[in-house]
């Protein structure tokens, strides 16, 4: 709570401010909307902070700013206060001799009130750029007190529930979401520069597909049919490649009815893209170029500090198969142990890791990888050769049909991207869908449905294609050194 009401609780402050608003209304205050801002605080600071005090006085620079009062010092017949706009803060100097009526009103305004200020720039004796107010106008009366300026919102969950207050009080939060916006803009620039077409595909699907995940279910009243919030746009984007759009991308939300953690949110943002006449090796090269561009454009560095360690995007990204990664981080494991179901079961039993009796060799290998290796992949790393049995939409390897031409991209121990050469054999895809249906019937809630319309689209002919999905929320976490995915989502879902 602000220093003006340190001895009052929030309800008492709210009551006092409501009374002030009632008095303002009696005097004709009606939340005016005629003041026009012409300058932002940060732009003025950048332009004039280095200007000498005497030179600035000779220039007679007139400005018009607006923002929220976040600090004020009333000193008899003169006061200083800071206003905060989207770009930053600037100081204002107000004298009773210049504006006696306004000054008397100002003494009754509160931190959090939004004002418009017109005046002339000058520098104080300490060198701080300041506006000598010639006109000050109350634009919005704030009824609720701001958090303490030194501590902000101390309750982390309250930050998520009342993000609007967090953004007022916490400069780091504002920076996080500005970086998020700049990152998404940079994604679009890179995709557009590489001749990809941005498209929009349905958010409600008659058949969930495109990923192994549990969907949210809803009902379309007019059509009287069950619909599913999309878990991935993949099958619709590939339909567009069938239709002749050879490079497409979409930045949008996906929804998965699964657990919440520091790395998972049921509603999340993805960049997903597809390129005809390319394979997964092309996409790994493309991804390296993309991440170099994002680092240069958004952060102006290719070395990022995350949770006390440095991620180096300058070096070539390491590429390891699933088996190679297991052997690298488990030097005691022999390669032949990974080649049989019994060998993998023994390894998992020794480590105390659960598995199902129905899990095949590939699934057992992935359990071992995900539970013991994934978290150790701190530097940018591509993991390749994912088993066919867990990759129902990916093309089989020409050299080993038990694995696919697929990669997952890891940074700081978490999956950031998933890409592969697309399966464009309609008969093979239909058979894999049938196996997914068998798994669903056996109780796997994340297994895929059989999508006959997608099979029909493949039967028209999908050119050789590669596709990739990149998790934007997790990438923002890295770029902003954030510990939780909820720190980078403006309004994350919370338990009521």
Swiss-Prot record:
Cofactor: binding comment: Binds 3 Mg(2+) ions per subunit.
Catalytic class of the enzyme: ligase
EC code(s) of this entry: 6.1.1.6
Gene Ontology MF, one: magnesium ion binding
Keywords (A to Z) from UniProt: Aminoacyl-tRNA synthetase, ATP-binding, Cytoplasm, Ligase, Magnesium, Metal-binding, Nucleotide-binding, Protein biosynthesis
Catalytically driven reaction(s): tRNA(Lys) + L-lysine + ATP = L-lysyl-tRNA(Lys) + AMP + diphosphate
Disulfide-linked positions: none
Binding locations of Mg(2+) 1: 408, 415
Binding site for Mg(2+) 2: 415
GO annotation, cellular component aspect: cytosol
Gene Ontology BP annotations: lysyl-tRNA aminoacylation
CDD domains: LysRS_core, LysRS_N
One Pfam family here: tRNA-synt_2
Keyword Nucleotide-binding: yes
UniProt-annotated location(s): Cytoplasm
PANTHER family the UniProt entry points to: LYSINE--TRNA LIGASE, CHLOROPLASTIC_MITOCHONDRIAL, LYSYL-TRNA SYNTHETASE
Oligomer and partners: Homodimer.
Family, per entry: Belongs to the class-II aminoacyl-tRNA synthetase family.
Designated name of the protein: Lysine--tRNA ligase
Organism: Legionella pneumophila subsp. pneumophila (strain Philadelphia 1 / ATCC 33152 / DSM 7513)
Lineage: Bacteria, Pseudomonadati, Pseudomonadota, Gammaproteobacteria, Legionellales
Gene: lysS
């Amino acid at each position: 709570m602000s220093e003006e009401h340190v001895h009052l609780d929030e309800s008492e402050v709210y009551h006092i401010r409501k009374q002030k608003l009632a008095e303002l209304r009696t005097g004709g205050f009606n939340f005016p909307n005629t003041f026009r801002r012409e300058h932002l605080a940060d732009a003025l600071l950048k332009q004039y902070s280095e200007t000498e005090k005497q030179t600035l006085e000779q220039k007679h620079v007139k400005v018009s700013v607006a923002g929220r009062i976040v600090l004020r010092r009333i000193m008899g017949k003169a006061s200083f206060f800071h206003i905060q706009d989207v770009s930053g803060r600037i100081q204002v100097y107000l004298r009773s001799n210049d504006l006696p009526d306004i000054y008397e009103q100002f003494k009754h305004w509160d931190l959090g009130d939004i004002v418009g200020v017109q005046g002339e720039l000058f520098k104080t004796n300490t060198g701080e750029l300041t506006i000598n107010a010639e006109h000050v106008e109350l634009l919005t009366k704030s009824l609720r007190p701001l958090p303490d300026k030194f501590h902000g919102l101390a309750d982390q969950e309250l930050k998520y529930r009342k993000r609007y207050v967090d953004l007022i009080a916490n400069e780091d939060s504002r920076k996080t979401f500005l970086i998020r916006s700049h990152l998404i803009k940079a994604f679009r620039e890179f995709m557009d520069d590489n001749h990809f077409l941005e498209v929009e595909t349905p958010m409600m699907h008659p058949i969930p597909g495109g990923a192994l995940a549990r969907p949210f279910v809803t009902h379309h009243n007019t059509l009287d049919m069950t619909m599913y919030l999309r878990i991935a746009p993949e099958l619709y984007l590939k339909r567009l490649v069938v239709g002749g759009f050879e490079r497409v991308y979409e930045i949008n939300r996906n929804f998965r009815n699964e657990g919440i953690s520091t790395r998972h949110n049921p509603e999340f943002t993805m960049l997903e893209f597809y390129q005809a006449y390319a394979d997964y090796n092309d996409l790994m090269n493309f991804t390296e170029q993309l991440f170099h561009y994002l680092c240069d454009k958004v952060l102006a560095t290719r070395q990022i500090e995350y949770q006390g360690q440095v991620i180096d995007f300058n070096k070539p990204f390491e590429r390891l198969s699933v088996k190679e990664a297991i052997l690298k981080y488990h030097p005691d494991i022999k390669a032949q142990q990974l080649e049989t179901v019994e060998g993998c079961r023994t390894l998992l039993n020794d480590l105390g890791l659960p598995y199902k009796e129905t899990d095949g060799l590939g699934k057992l290998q992935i359990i071992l990888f995900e539970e013991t290796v994934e978290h150790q992949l701190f530097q940018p790393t591509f993991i390749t050769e994912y088993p066919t049995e867990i990759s129902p939409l990916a093309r089989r390897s020409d050299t080993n049909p038990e694995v696919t031409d697929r990669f997952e991209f890891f940074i700081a121990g978490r999956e950031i991207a998933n890409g592969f050469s697309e399966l464009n054999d309609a008969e093979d895809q239909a058979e894999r869908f049938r196996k997914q249906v068998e798994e669903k019937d056996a109780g796997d809630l994340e297994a895929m449905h059989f999508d006959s319309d997608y099979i029909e689209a493949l039967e028209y002919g999908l050119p050789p294609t590669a596709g990739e999905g990149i998790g934007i929320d997790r990438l923002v976490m890295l770029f902003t050194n954030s510990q939780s995915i909820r720190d980078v989502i403006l309004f994350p879902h919370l338990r009521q």
